[in-house]
Design a protein with these regions (language model features):
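C-terminal helical "tail/cap" subdomain of flavin- and related membrane-associated enzymes
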Residues: 7, 68-186
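FAD/FMN-dependent oxidoreductases across multiple families
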Residues: 1-78
Length: 186
C-alpha cells in the first residue's frame, strides 16, 4: 500500500474509469515464412499474453535459431525458412499456451486447496529428483530447453502429481514413473 499515491491522483475513480481497457491475446501461426522470400519472428510470429515473462526471450531465441540455420544452409533461403518454421512454430505455440495457463493459474488456482497440495508435492519432488523433476518456470528461466519440451515435461509432471494426489499412484509408483518418464536435464 502506497498511501502517498492518493495525493498525486486528484480524481482516482474518474481517472481509472476514463482509461481504455486494453485487450490481451495470443497469435498462433501455422508457419512463419513464405517460400524463400520472407520470415517472421518475435512478436510478429508469436504474440503472447505477458504472464510468463518470455516475450523478449522467445524473440531472441528465434534470432539464435534463425542464425544457426543461416550458417548451416548457406544461402538456401527456402530450406533456412522451412527448417526455422518447423523448429520454432511448436515452441511459439508452447510458450503461448504456458503463458495463458500461467494466467489462469494465478487467477483461479492459488486459493484452491488442491492446488496448494500440488505445489507442496511439486517442491518435495523437485528436492528429491532435482535433476529430473523441474517446475516449468525453472525449466524456462534456468535451462536452455525448447519451449515445446518444457511444455511436454510440464504436462507429464502435472499428470503424475494429480494421479498421486487422486490416489491412482502410490509413492513408489510415482517415483518409478518419474525415473522412467523424465530424463535428467541438469
Amino acid at each position: 500500500y502506497f498511501s502517498d499515491t492518493l495525493q498525486l491522483i486528484s480524481d482516482l475513480p474518474g481517472e481509472f474509469l476514463k482509461k481504455p481497457v486494453g485487450k490481451l491475446g495470443s497469435i498462433y501461426c501455422s508457419k512463419w515464412h513464405y517460400n524463400d522470400r520472407a520470415a517472421i519472428f518475435g512478436d510478429a510470429a508469436h504474440t503472447i499474453v505477458p504472464f510468463f515473462g518470455q516475450g523478449m526471450n522467445a524473440s531472441l531465441q528465434d534470432c539464435t535459431v534463425m542464425y544457426s540455420f543461416v550458417k548451416k544452409y548457406d544461402g538456401n533461403w527456402d530450406k533456412i525458412f522451412t527448417k526455422f518454421s518447423e523448429k520454432q512454430v511448436p515452441n511459439g505455440h508452447a510458450i503461448a499456451d504456458m503463458a495463458l495457463e500461467n494466467y489462469i493459474e494465478m487467477r483461479d488456482s492459488v486459493n484452491d486447496p488442491k492446488y496448494k497440495i500440488k505445489r507442496e508435492l511439486e517442491f518435495d519432488l523437485e528436492n528429491k529428483f532435482w535433476d529430473r523433476f523441474v517446475p516449468r518456470y525453472s525449466m524456462v528461466s534456468f535451462h536452455e530447453l525448447p519451449y515445446s519440451e518444457v511444455y511436454r515435461r510440464g504436462e507429464v509432471q502435472s499428470k503424475l502429481m494429480y494421479s498421486f494426489i487422486g490416489g491412482d499412484l502410490t509413492k513408489k509408483k510415482l517415483y518409478e514413473q518419474i525415473e522412467s518418464n523424465l530424463t535428467p536435464i541438469r
